[in-house]
Regions:
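Class I SAM-dependent methyltransferase SAM-binding "motif I" and its flanking Rossmann-like core
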Residues: 136-167, 172
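N-terminal beta-strand-loop-alpha-helix module at the start
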Residues: 16-83
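Short phosphate-binding loop-to-helix
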Residues: 90-111
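N-terminal glycine-rich phosphate/adenylate-binding segment common to multiple enzyme folds
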Residues: 114-128
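Long, charged alpha-helical interface segments
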Residues: 158-229
């Protein structure tokens, strides 16, 4: 997926995941402890690569080049065994139990001047973890452009105007967080025209892109968009 983003508008293309529109000098790759990706992404162009202590285990099992990790964060309740001695200089101990490992990793990434993060391992498994990750992303959405990837879709908090390209035939879901008002769409099989979505009444899941380009605009609230990969 390609990202060309500004403060209030974002253009995303499904064709080329490497051409993101954001200088890679400002972009991080983060692995957290959800369901591991079946295929690891290419890493050479990221400014920073990091993982939680739990994700370290599946990266090792998948023969990920661990020397590329800039830091490993967490409370280290997942013991790393002999690897502790090898990679101890990259450990960042974050014992605060009031924050998730994902939240603490985002704090470190933001402190180091990064503006965008691609996240793998954010979904699947225990659903409370997924909801916690989504909430952490919400807290950082004005500071970091966070995009999640899993086996089925990519998802993110959308700006007020979002343009999706090369998406014809793909499932597009609009999820209010928790209320999104004045939504207007173009290029969806079931369009919205200045309508609202409310988590307690109506959500916009499982829509379908009827055109190659889909435009989503909304007024008040926050909106999570899921795009089928």
């Amino acid at each position: 997926i390609t990202f060309l983003c500004w403060r209030d508008i974002c253009r995303k293309s499904i064709m080329n995941p490497k051409n993101t529109g954001i200088p890679m000098i400002d972009k991080a790759l983060l692995f957290i402890n959800g369901v591991p990706p079946k295929n690891l992404p290419e890493t050479e162009d990221y400014a920073m690569i990091a993982c939680s202590d739990g994700a370290f285990h599946y990266l090792k099992e998948k023969n990920f080049p661990l020397d590329k990790l800039d830091f490993i964060s967490g409370d280290f309740d997942s013991h790393l065994g002999n690897d502790e001695a090898i990679y101890h200089d990259r450990f960042i101990f974050t014992p605060d139990q009031d924050k998730t490992d994902f939240h603490k990793s985002l704090e470190i990434i933001q402190e180091r001047g990064i503006t965008a993060v691609d996240v793998y391992g954010g979904s699947g498994g225990e659903m409370d973890h997924f909801l916690g990750n989504l909430t952490a992303a919400f807290l950082f959405k004005n500071h970091l452009e966070i995009t999640f990837y899993d086996e089925f879709s990519t998802y993110f908090f959308a700006p007020k105007t979002l343009v999706l390209e090369n998406v014809k035939g793909k499932i597009i879901s609009l999820y209010p967080f928790p209320l999104t008002e004045n939504i207007t769409t173009k290029g969806l099989n079931w369009p919205l025209n200045n309508e609202s979505l409310d988590i307690s009444k109506r959500i916009g899941t499982r829509n379908l892109a009827s055109e190659e380009t889909v435009v989503i605009h909304y007024g008040k609230g926050d909106l999570v968009v899921f795009v089928e990969i």
